[in-house]
Design a protein with these regions (language model features):
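Ribonuclease/tRNase effector modules and their secretory precursors
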Residues: 1-88
Length: 88
């Protein structure tokens, strides 16, 4: 997937995506790695949003839940580490 823009909320926004990812131990950089090099994209069964699966440079397997704003822009909602066999 190639997106030209990834929208991040302010770091100190308690309801923002930066903080939500951080609560799961995932950094913005890791989310961007997965979105730029996703191994699989599917739909979440719980939210219906698109999810991207991929590995970080550190070897973590992450699931990133996101919203497509347009063809070039995404808004990551949350992200967390998942076992490789888990599906949305």
């Amino acid at each position: 997937m190639l997106y030209r823009a990834i929208i991040w909320d302010l770091d100190d926004d308690p309801d923002g995506n930066v903080r939500h990812c951080a609560e799961h131990g995932v950094t913005q950089e890791e989310v961007e790695e997965v979105l730029e090099n996703a191994q699989d994209v599917d739909l979440s069964r719980s939210s219906g949003r698109p999810v991207a699966f991929g590995d970080t440079a550190a070897g973590r397997h992450l699931m990133v839940v996101f919203e497509e704003i347009d063809d070039d822009t995404v808004y990551p909602v949350t992200a967390y580490e998942v076992p490789r066999r888990q599906r949305p």
